[in-house]
Amino acid sequence: MVKKFREEQLKLAKKVVVKDEFDKIKLVGGVDQAFVGNEVISAVIVCDYKTMKVIEKQYTVVKANVPYIPSYLSYREAPAIIEAVNKLEKKPDVLLVDGHGIAHPRKIGLASHVGLSLDIPTIGIAKALLCGEIKEDRIVIEESTRGYTLVTKEHANPLFVSPGHRVGLKSSLEIVKNCIRLPHKIPEPIHLAHKYADKIRKELENKNPRLKPNIFNHKKEFGCIE
């Protein structure tokens, strides 16, 4: 399974576009996941880019058909994200994804995978470095800049921002900066998606008390091992 995924990722990575392919941004989306039992809850929020007012929200619950495998998170979470985004009536001009973009060993983290699958501009935002090293504020992998660190709050650890698909390096950083609303550390669309996914998770648990949160989930990856 891993060998197959690796070969597919290497092929897909060649299709990733790291340049701006979008017009003026009016709507920005954020997506985050929660887990209950063996199901993935994917929540997507669409906000007005200037005001961060919520325009639309959707969610989906999909069975996780692939186990958690470090650096292959896309095969576990992307199907739920794609289904949730496809339910939207108002499509975002750019989608912010809780995970890595090209700052990934094979240049195709969750944000890149989702961007390719949906053919939309995406940006990855993670809370820990997956691979490479930091030089000043740049994420450098194999002597190539793959993204940037971003400190959004005083005394807070940085976020790791990288293009997913159809967004350039500098634009990725600027878009994420524009989506920060203190006191929240992470971009507002992802913050809201996180809250929404958690709300759905609790509702599902209340309907079926035997369901339990899956503690070995993507938050480990979001921490460092996508």
Predicted regions and their residues:
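Catalytic-site beta-strand/loop segments enriched in glycine and acidic/polar residues
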Residues: 82-114, 118-120
